[in-house]
């Protein structure tokens, strides 16, 4: 017989267009080994598309990864993708035969429905573009980074009671 064990780390859902930004840093991804990078890509795509559930590849399981590795890989995806501000956690379902794990399903959980996440992401992009347009195009790399840093520091008010107090939505949308 096959046994399924479900564990939750939060909950909600939505639609299928990618909200991932192109060309960002892959700092956390680079810290993972090849098997972990497989799951990173699958989790990244699932969260970016707000997919209901994805079956994680079994090769990493065969190479020794298990459900204990999901959270670390999930955190790496969030480190590399602040634009996934609408993700609140995940659930997974582990499939076993005896003591052996034979499959794991992964599902992100979301604070917003898909259309609202898309709308908020667009508002964030527009505000970011406004901020970037204030930087002279001939500024040095250092001056560009400094200008963005100062804009964030001087424009962000921290409100611990705000619903988005720990993500980019609070910085760009207040």
Go through each PLM region and give its residues.
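Active-site neighborhood of thiol-dependent amide/isopeptide-bond enzymes
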Residues: 141, 151-174
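Conserved hydrophobic/aromatic pocket- or pore-lining residues that grip, position, or stack substrates
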Residues: 148
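Short, well-ordered surface patches within globular domains
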Residues: 145
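N-terminal accessory/pre-domain segments preceding catalytic cores
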Residues: 1-140
């Amino acid at each position: 017989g096959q046994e399924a064990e479900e564990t939750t780390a939060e909950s909600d859902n939505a639609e299928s267009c990618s909200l991932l930004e192109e060309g960002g840093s892959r700092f956390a991804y680079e810290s993972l080994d090849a098997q972990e990078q497989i799951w990173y890509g699958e989790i990244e795509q699932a969260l970016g598309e707000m997919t209901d559930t994805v079956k994680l590849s079994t090769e990493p399981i065969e190479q020794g990864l298990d459900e204990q590795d999901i959270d670390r890989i999930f955190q790496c995806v969030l480190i590399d993708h602040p634009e996934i501000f609408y993700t609140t956690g995940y659930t997974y379902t582990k499939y076993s035969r005896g003591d052996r794990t034979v499959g794991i399903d992964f599902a992100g959980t979301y604070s917003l429905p898909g259309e609202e996440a898309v709308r908020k992401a667009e508002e964030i992009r527009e505000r970011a573009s406004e901020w970037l347009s204030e930087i002279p195009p001939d500024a040095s790399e250092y001056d560009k980074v400094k200008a963005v840093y100062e804009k964030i520091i001087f424009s962000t008010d921290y409100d611990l009671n705000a619903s988005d107090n720990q993500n980019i939505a609070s910085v760009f949308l207040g």
